[in-house]
Amino acid sequence: MHAPQSVAVTLSVALALVPALAGGCASTPVRPAAHGAEAPVDPAIAPLSFMAGNWILSQPNGATIEEHWQAPRGKALLGSFRRVLGNGITPFYEFTQIVAEKDRVVLRQIHVHGNFDTDPRRAEPMVLVMEKCTASMATFVPAKDGANAGALARVTYSAPDRNTLLLVVEPRPEAGKPAEKPLEFRMKRAG
């Protein structure tokens, strides 16, 4: 058993070493940006503000789809998606960024399994470019430069009303086969 005094000395030494072990991080205070000092929203992505929010869809099979979009800020907005099955298992997640670049708006998305392992078929991000956009709708199509989009033709987000976000995923038609029906996810604002 250690004497109370030696425990106090050991604790004091350990606490004194924390800033050094943390690479000096603890000695540099973090100051929040001054109010009003935020980067202005790039005009190319400003119309996408209709996507911001928490969105949810309860499916008849007991699964729940959730999508969360941060508001556009600077040149980007970020989104996350998960599908939770009725038994509580999340088979996959998707993380998406939409970024205003020099001459286009790009949507990049990564897909990971529920255990956060990368899907080998989707090791590289899917890359789409904005085809058209209004104040309540945005359509993205595969980029020509390595889109990694598989059989995807287009993705459209729209807001039929303030509390609904509609995601439509359209497959690319295959030659000689009947066109597949688009997938539609009509999500409601959560909270």
Predicted regions and their residues:
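N-terminal secretory signal peptides that target proteins for export/translocation
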Residues: 1-7
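Edge beta-strand at a domain terminus
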Residues: 37, 120-135, 162-191
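Central antiparallel beta-sheet cores of small beta-barrel/beta-sandwich binding domains
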Residues: 42, 57-145
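Short, structured patches in soluble enzyme cores that scaffold and shape functional sites
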Residues: 142-144, 159, 169-171
